[in-house]
Each structure stands twice: as C-alpha cells, then as structure tokens.
Amino acid sequence: MSDDWDNNTAAAKTISFGSNPSGFGGGSGFGSGNTGGFGSGNAGGTGFGSSNNGGSGFGGNNNVGPRFGNGNAGGTGFGSGNAGGTGFGSGNAGGTGFGSGNAGGTGFGSGNAGGTGFGGGNAGGTGFGSGNAGGTGLGSGNAGGTGFGSGNAGGTGFGSGNAGGTGFGSGKAGGTGFGSGKAGGTGFGGNSNSGSGFGSGLTNGFGSGNNHESGFGGGKSGGFGGGNSGGSGFGSGGNSNGFGSGGGGQDRGERNNNCFNCQQPGHRSNDCPEPKKEREPRVCYNCQQPGHNSRDCPEERKPREGRNGFTGGSSGFGGGNGGGTGFDSGLTNGFGSGNNGESGFGSGGFGGNSNGFGSGGGGQDRGERNNNCFNCQQPGHRSNDCPEPKKEREPRVCYNCQQPGHNSRDCPEERKPREGRNGFTSGFGGGNDGGFGGGNAEGFGNNEERGPMKCFNCKGEGHRSAECPEPPRGCFNCGEQGHRSNECPNPAKPREGAEGEGPKATYVPVEDNMEEVFNMQKISEGLMFNKFFDAEVKITSDKKPVGVKTCKTFSEANLGETMKKNVAHAGYTKTTPIQQYTLPLIHQGHDIMACAQTGSGKTAAFLLPIMARLIDENDLNTAGEGGCYPRCIILTPTRELTDQIYNEGRKFAYQTMMEIRPVYGGLAVGYNKGQIEKGATIIVGTVGRIKHFCEEGTIKLDKCRFFVLDEADRMIDAMGFGTDIDTIVNYESMPKKENRQTLMFSATFPDSVQEAARNHLKEGYIMLAIDKIGAANKCVLQEFEKCDRSEKKDKLLEILGIDIDSYTTEKNSEVYTKKTIVFVSQRAMADTLASILSSAQVPAITIHGAREQRERSEALRQFRNGSKPVLIATAVAERGLDIKGVDHVINYDMPDNIDDYIHRIGRTGRVGNAGRATSFISEDCNLLSELVRVLSDADQLVPEWMQGASGGNFGASFGFESSVPTQKQDEDCW
C-alpha cells in the first residue's frame, strides 16, 4: 500500500470542511486536501477524508465504525465502516481504492497506477483488495473469514473467505487468479503470464498459473502469493512499506550465481583459479560480536524481527505491535501485528496463537526461542558442555502405540494415521482436514494414511527386508546375485529420471590458459627414449610390404610455420617411430590401423597431419556455414582421454583459425551445445554425447573428411562401443568410407578386433605395427607380489612406506614426492583405500565412474599438480592418460585381460622415462601364462614361481628362446 495513507491528517490548503460539516448524531468529520477533501461522520462515528494533487478522498462512517479514505495524484480513495467495522480506501496515480467494513469486519482497498482495489469485510471477516498498473484486485471476507485479492499489470485477482475460511487471489500480466476458502478451509489462486490459476477448497485448495511465478510463495523469490521477484503481492516487500511485509516475502532480486571468491560467472569458488580471499570473521547473530555463535552468546537474547518472513514490518499492512484491527498503528491494535497475535492477519508471526490467519500448529507462535542447556535448563552453554551430572532421559516410546521397547516400524499394533505431519498442523497447514495442506483430507502436502510398512525386498507386509524369506534382490545395475550395484563389475547403466533421461549434467569446465596447456603435458624425453627406435616396424597393405619415406624430424613434415612453432613450444624435438610413418601416410590419404607401445606419441601422430592438411587447404568450419560441420571426428572411450586430446589439439592449433571442441557426457548439455554451435573443424568426444548431438542435428556430418578411433580396440570390441560406432558411421549424412579417411590407433589390437575393424576401412588400408602387436612398454620395470586378498592392504601400505601398526609415514617418504596410480576393480574399494591412506596422512584421491564429472576433473587436476600424489582409479583411467611424472603403477586388483594390463602399466614410462609397475597376484591368476609372454617380450625377468604356475615351458609355447634373462641382465637393462 502507498505511504500516502499518512496524509490523512494533512492540513487543508484550499477547501476544508471540519467540525462535522455533514455530521449527524454527534459524530465528527474531518477533511483535508490540496484541492478538495471530504469527510463525514454519522451516529457518533468518525470519518476521515484526504485528497492531494487533484485527487478525491471520501470518508464516511455509521454506527461507530471508523472509515478512512485517501486519494493522491488524481486517484480516488473510498473508505466506509459500519456497525463497528473499519474501512480503508486508498487511490494513487489515477487508481481507485475501495474499502468497506461492516458488522465488526475490516475492509482494505488500494488502487495504484490506474488499477482498482476492492476490499470488503463483513461479520467480523477481513477483506483485502489491491490493484496496480491497471489491474483489479478484489478481496472479500465474511463471517470471520479472510479474503485477499491482488491484480497487477492488467490482471485480475479475486479472493474470498467465508465462515472462517481464507481465500487468496492473484492475477498478473493480464492473467486471472481466483481463490476461495469456505468452512474453515483455505483456497489459493495464482496466475502469471496470461494463464489462469484457480484454487478452491471446502477443506483445502491450492492453485497456481503458468510458470508457477505466482500463487503461494509466488514469483522468483517473492512473498506469499506474491508477484515476480517478491513484488506486488500478498506477502511481498521487505521489513517496511509492504503489504504483509516481512523477511520471507522480501525481494531478494535476481539470484547471484557468480563465484563467491572472485565474483565472476562460470565456476564455483572451490574451482576458482584466483587466490583465495580472506573472508571476514563471522559474528554472533545476537550481539554482532565475533568469537562465538548466537547460541553461546552471553548477552540477553534479542527478539528476531520478521523471522520466517511473516511477522511485522513497520508500515503497510502487517505493521505495528499488539493485536486487533488498527491500521499501521505501532502501538496497539496493529493490523497483522507481531505480539499477542489476537485477531490479526499473521499475528504472532505468520499464524498466531488464536484467531489469526494460519493460527495453530504449523504457523504457531513459538514465542521466544529457548536456547538453554537441555540437561540443566540454564543458559550460556549446551548440554554436551554442561557441568551438571547428566540426567536420565525418559525411555523412548513407539511413535505409533506410545509403548516402550520397540520402534514404530516394528510395532505390532495397527498403523495409526499420522496427523498434520511435516510441520503443518492446525491453521496454516492445520489439523486433520483444515488449513493449508494439513492432515488426512485433501490439500497441499496432505498426509493420507500410510498403511502398514512393506518389505523393501518382496514388497510384502508384516516383516522387514532383513527378515524376508524371499531370495534377496539382485544387483540394481545388472540384476545378478552376489554383489551390490556399487560393486558391480559390469558397465554402469544410465538411471532414468521422470522423463526417461538420466540426471542432468551441470558441469561447466574452466579452461586453462594456453601457457598452462603447453606446460601441463610437456614430458621431457627420458634416458630410455632411444629404446623406441630399437623396435621392429612392420608396414603392410593387403598383407604385402609397403615402402614409405619417413619423416625423421618435424621440420621434414608438411606442417605450416605456425604449427611447427607450436610443436617446438610443446616440447617435441624428435619424431617417434609411429610419428615418422603416420605423418606422411595420413598426408597421402591412406586409411590406417596403427599399433604402437604406450607412451610413444600416438596422439600427435594423427592430430598433426590432419590439422596440417585442413589448415593448408583452408578447409575450416566457419560461421558462414550456419552450424557445426566438422571436418574431423575423433572418438575416444573415456571423458578424461577426450579432454586430454582436446588440450593437445589446442596446443597445435594455437594462433591458427582452426577450432577444436570437446564433446562428452558430464558436461552441461546446454553449454556443450552452445560451444559446438559456434563452429568446430575438429570434434573430439565420447560416443554417447556425439551420437546424441548427431541425432538432434547439432553436429552435421556431411563434410566429415577424417574419422578417427583412438584406443580403437576398446571402441570396436563387442563388449565396448561397437554398436554405437556402427550407428554413427551409418548415418545418412556421414560420407561413405570410400569418401573419407578412417584412422585407428591403439597399443593393442587382438585378432578379433582387427577383423571387425576392416568393415570401417577402405580396401588397401595400411596396417602399421611398431614392435610386436600387444607388446608392453620396455621402459616399465614390471614387478609382481604374490599375495592373497587378505594381504593386499598391508602390502600396499608397505610399498607406500606407511607403518602398518601406527598408520604413520615418515615426513621425507617418497610417497609425498612421487606420483603413484593404484588400480582397483571396484569403485567401493577405491573409496575405501583412499580413506585408509588419508587416515595415514597420505594425500590420496579417487577417480571412477560413480563420481561427478566435476569431481573427476578436479581429481586429475590435483594429481597432475602433485597436491594429491596418490591416485586410486578404476578402468576409467587405464587407457590413454598422459600424466607427467607418474613413477609407479600398482595393480591392487589385476584386470580381466592382458590388454588392459598393458594399458595400465603404460601410464608410467612415458617418452623414454623409466617407470615401475607392481602387481598383486595370486598363483591361480588366469593371466599367468600371458604375463610370462609379456615379460619375455620386454626382456624382463620372469619370477620362478610364475614359470612353474604357467606350465614351465613358456618359451616354446610362444616361440621364444627357452632362456630367461638373469637378474644381472635385468639390472643392465635399467
């Protein structure tokens, strides 16, 4: 309501009539106005009328009822009170306000900016009407009921309350809201954006219009039934000048989602790249002094004003102290006042002790909060700090039958209905069948009888799942018995939500600047780098040898000057064997299936020639094409590998016109889509997200020239992504294999995968093998610890230098300075080991499929920068990751096949740097014979116990010489 209500007592300047100009029966009339004011009082009543700036104010009263009328800026205010009732009318800026109160009721009417507000109260009821910006608000209260009506921006709001009921109506932006409450019930109606919201109930009703921007608690943050952002509605406003104002209805404005540390958008404070700012010390809420919380405050407890958003204010409806029906009084009889709360809207807070809107349980006036000690009832400390002897507490009883000795879920008695649960009893949310959402009968948040508890396993009654006679339910993920879903060895299935989709991804990554990107993955060549050049190279086409002119240096490759500078800046000095052959072969247009050891530079082997050709031919995706038409699609098996290849591509494309974009699950879909819609010449991503964007038309494959599968054996394997790969290559818009160049790279290529891969390659493709296919990196020293499951934990602690008895570590232990990756098979084990290591003061972190993408990215970041030197990982980290300075890989659990073993140990020993791999293994491991072959291929020592367990004559079985390197020979290799 307008502050102009205070003008009722203004002195007359032009025309004034006083001393009962038209008074009857000993009444008095007052009138004031800049242009004209009228007031009349009859039968001992009092009438007030006020008008300013050409407005008209009319006040009249009969039978001892007060009436107030106020008009400002061309508005008209009418107020009428009869039979002890009170009427308030206010009109501002050409609006019209009508207020009428009869038979002890109260009526409020307010009109602003050309709107019309009607308020009527009869027989002790209260009616509120508010109209703003051409809207119409009608409020009517009869027989002790309360009606609220609000209309804004051309909308219409109707509120009606009868027989002790409450009705709320709100209409915004041309919409209409209706609310009615009868027989002690409550009706809420809200509407926004031209929709219609209807709420009515004999017991309870709740209605909301479009977008849920109005109605109960309407708007973005607004008050009870308020408008957008808390404005212009019942309950809107702040601590003053608000209709029903108070904390909860306060307009908080648009929510700020910026970083708390640097105030920039796009990330949270724990991801902020800026230095952490010191926060101001927190102070006591009661005395505003630092050093303690309000519950421990030695000062006298101060009353909290406007708590829960539904108490006083200082002016406007809802102001004052005391109870009753006075307007804005501040002394006693304040309408909707804070204290006592009798007969006022929101009295005693929102919902007073009696006769107030929402009175009773849910909105009950709790009075001053008791912060005394629970044990001795004295202030100044909590019960756990109490110096008095602990008092015995009464035994807990069953919630259902009130008898001790058992919980309600085990109660043998018939289940009783729980009345008024969730804090809404009697009044606002009240009782069994009255109030907002109360009890058993209809309403918002109603509590229907729950019925008997059912077994979680079989859904039967009479027992709990722990006592169920039926077989236990299988794994939630795969349906098999014997394990839970968090320990499931099978690939995780997406969990569908209400719309048939998984949970929405919200992660938006913060990209590193280019200098950080260049330094992040810069791994210097190690002392064993030349071992790569000792490997035998086989290059064939249709099983026939092929001659190739190799590129011994990057300067010999067909790279532009800008890319050559970027390659040098990235720390590349000499081409590896895989790069020497693929750089010219890809430039010549061949399809390739390439196999080389881990850590030998395969990513650069396909990225450099593809990017150089596209830049040289100026074949780039530009904004003029009207969408994302990538020239190259790179598919990877994991999000982490996608991100790594993306950053590698950023280095090579630096200061060129080429754009490379990552696409993978876990990123916010809207953000990811917005990035690629800007255009991307190269898309690198995981299969699922790329398939999704292709199907919806965001990624258009018509101009795709290069199709790359990294870790191709995993991508094509029948247990991997083979079906989805087939779907992508068979899209109608995807060029046929004869019209595109297909490239496949991996460190392992089983025969079965090679056969399946041929379906995607042109006739005459090149098969390139550096060393033996499936050979381990010779720069990695492979060690084995024979132990059973119960010995693994202690063995791990011993290797990491942790005292098994005291769980302590020497400060100068290598575990703090060297990076270690521990591979496990189950997510639960990863979390368990991380907890154990952390308790021993060893900084450890986990990465597995159950972690959110934000957590996975943060884990890799902390491992890369050394703040967490131990990474415990599942299979998501076993392929492709190129992390600088990994000294040791530990296979806590052995993988299922030899190829995964080779990939795991390949996380160390990169680019000729010496690495170490330790595997915990038992004598019945099914990989023993293959491990013997891998060790022999790498010229490493085979433990005697492994020779015997694998059958002894391993050399003849795999075509190797029967002699095994001696310990001395092995030392010479290192």
From Swiss-Prot:
Annotated keywords: ATP-binding, Helicase, Hydrolase, Metal-binding, Nucleotide-binding, Repeat, RNA-binding, Zinc, Zinc-finger
Catalyzes what? ATP + H2O = ADP + phosphate + H(+)
Naming one, the record's GO cellular component terms include:
nucleus
The region called Disordered is annotated at 212-435
Biased-composition ranges for Polar residues?
256-267, 370-381
Query: Quaternary state and partners of this protein?
Result: Interacts (via C-terminus) with kgb-1.
Q: Which InterPro entries does the record associate with it? A: DEAD/DEAH_box_helicase_dom, Helicase_ATP-bd, Helicase_C-like, P-loop_NTPase, RNA-helicase_DEAD-box_CS, RNA_helicase_DEAD_Q_motif, Znf_CCHC, Znf_CCHC_sf
Q: Which cysteines are joined by disulfide bonds?
A: none
- Give GO terms for biological process: cell differentiation; gamete generation; germ cell development; post-embryonic development; RNA metabolic process
**Which ranges belong to the motif DEAD box?**
710-713
Described by its record, this protein's role is as follows: Probable ATP-binding RNA helicase.
The UniProt regions of compositional bias labelled Basic and acidic residues, in chain numbering, are 268-282, 293-307, 382-396, 407-421
Q: Which residues form the Helicase C-terminal domain?
A: 803-950
EC numbers listed for it are 3.6.4.13
Q: What is the lineage of its organism?
A: Eukaryota, Metazoa, Ecdysozoa, Nematoda, Chromadorea
Q: Where is the composition biased (Gly residues)?
A: 215-250, 309-364, 426-435
GO-annotated molecular function: ATP binding; ATP hydrolysis activity; JUN kinase binding; mRNA binding; RNA helicase activity; zinc ion binding
Q: Which residues form a coiled coil?
A: none
Q: What class of enzyme is it?
A: hydrolase
Q: Which residues form the Helicase ATP-binding domain?
A: 583-767
Name by which UniProt lists this protein: ATP-dependent RNA helicase glh-2
Per the record, the similarity remark reads: Belongs to the DEAD box helicase family. DDX4/VASA subfamily.
Q: Where are the zinc fingers (CCHC-type)?
A: 257-274, 282-299, 371-388, 396-413, 453-470, 473-490
